[in-house]
């Protein structure tokens, strides 16, 4: 190792700022009897990242430092030693090539692994040979992968099917969370979590359960969320409605009826008059009706996915006489006819 008189170029800017702050605090603070302490930044670190062990309240008469892996000073656990006077760092048996010691006694460990989890001890060597020691620690968690969701049924039928979502992969010491349409999971007796929250089960699905589902995995050092999975709930048809609700007509009017039923996928419609099939359309149009068009008009809605049919019936009565032309209209027609005769 070369002399760590200045942070190496590979050091990220945040560590430079932290080290500078620590150095200034050490320089400006007057001698105190405060106890030597170690701060880990961060305390929880993701695998592959880096962690900085900061020393606080260094004694004034220090002449060197030694860092050890573990909670006690042991030659076999020595990571690196540093002599202030010569600014020389000497690696020990526990040195892995990922550690960098700084003049303010801070230790940077890069590309951490889960094996790095644990305690680290700093020994400050003083000119009076009354050395001081302090121990710090940090925890390394795995860098979480992007999870994915599998489902046993992405097109369930309302009030008939149950759906089980599973968030994968399984990772130890990890929290599993679920999101529905971008919101946290609602409280419902039909929603059940199991297998450490990895599995979300929807019992007897409802149409309101349709939407986007995501799972998120978390540990104290990182988090990751899956791509959304869409749940398409098949339902209906509900009992259809016929509009307009008008029931009484006069001869010569036009009859225009429309049928609608809530359904997923959209319903297919059929019309029956007095029990006789007429046509398969959502609208029924009969121009210039007569009294013979009176009767029962039934609309049938069919869902090809659920296999269900729903019907509704309206009674249409055609009575009275055809609309009579007004006197003004009659005079207008007469004048028009006479004018055509005169031209001939």
UniProtKB/Swiss-Prot annotation:
Q: What is the effect of changing residue 53 to A?
A: No effect on homodimerization. Reduces heterodimerization with CEACAM8
Q: Where is the Ig-like C2-type domain?
A: 145-232, 240-314
| Tissues and organs where the protein is expressed, per its UniProt entry | Expressed in neutrophils. Expressed in columnar epithelial and goblet cells of the colon. Expressed in numerous tumor cell lines (at protein level).
Q: Name one GO molecular function term.
A: protein heterodimerization activity
Keywords in UniProt for this one? Apoptosis, Cell adhesion, Cell membrane, Disulfide bond, Glycoprotein, GPI-anchor, Immunoglobulin domain, Lipoprotein, Membrane, Oncogene, Repeat, Signal
Q: What is the effect of changing residue 61 to H?
A: Inhibits homophilic and heterophilic cell adhesion
The protein's name in its UniProt record: Cell adhesion molecule CEACAM6
- What is the scientific name of the source organism? Homo sapiens (Human)
């Amino acid at each position: 190792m070369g002399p760590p008189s200045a942070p190496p170029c590979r050091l990220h800017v945040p560590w430079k700022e932290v080290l500078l702050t620590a150095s200034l605090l050490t320089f400006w603070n007057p001698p105190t009897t405060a106890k030597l302490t170690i701060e880990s930044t961060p305390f929880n670190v993701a695998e592959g990242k880096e962690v900085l062990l900061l020393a606080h309240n260094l004694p004034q008469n220090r002449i060197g430092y030694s860092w050890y892996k573990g909670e006690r000073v042991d030659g076999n656990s020595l990571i690196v030693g540093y002599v202030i006077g010569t600014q020389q760092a000497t690696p020990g048996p526990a040195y892995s090539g990922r550690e960098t010691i700084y003049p303010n006694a801070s230790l940077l460990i890069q590309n951490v692994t889960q094996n790095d989890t644990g305690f680290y001890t700093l020994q400050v060597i003083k000119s009076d040979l009354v050395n001081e020691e302090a121990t710090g620690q940090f925890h390394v968690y795995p860098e979480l992968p992007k999870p994915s969701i599998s489902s046993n049924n992405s097109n369930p039928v309302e009030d008939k099917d149950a759906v089980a979502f599973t968030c994968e992969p399984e990772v130890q010491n990890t929290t599993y969370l679920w999101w529905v349409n971008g919101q946290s999971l609602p409280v419902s007796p039909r929603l059940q979590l199991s297998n450490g929250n990895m599995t979300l089960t929807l019992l007897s699905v409802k149409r309101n359960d349709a939407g986007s589902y995501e799972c998120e995995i978390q540990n104290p050092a990182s988090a990751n969320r899956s791509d959304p999975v869409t749940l398409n709930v098949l339902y209906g048809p509900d009992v259809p409605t016929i509009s307009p609700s008008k029931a009484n007509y006069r001869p010569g009017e036009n009859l225009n009826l429309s049928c609608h039923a809530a359904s997923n996928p959209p319903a297919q419609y059929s019309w029956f008059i007095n029990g006789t099939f007429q046509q398969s359309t959502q609208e029924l149009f009969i121009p210039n009706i007569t009294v013979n068009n009176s009767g029962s008009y039934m609309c049938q809605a069919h869902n090809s996915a659920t296999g269900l049919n729903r019907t509704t019936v309206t009674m249409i009565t055609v009575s009275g006489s055809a609309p009579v032309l007004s006197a003004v209209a009659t005079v207008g027609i007469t004048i028009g006819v006479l004018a055509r005769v005169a031209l001939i």
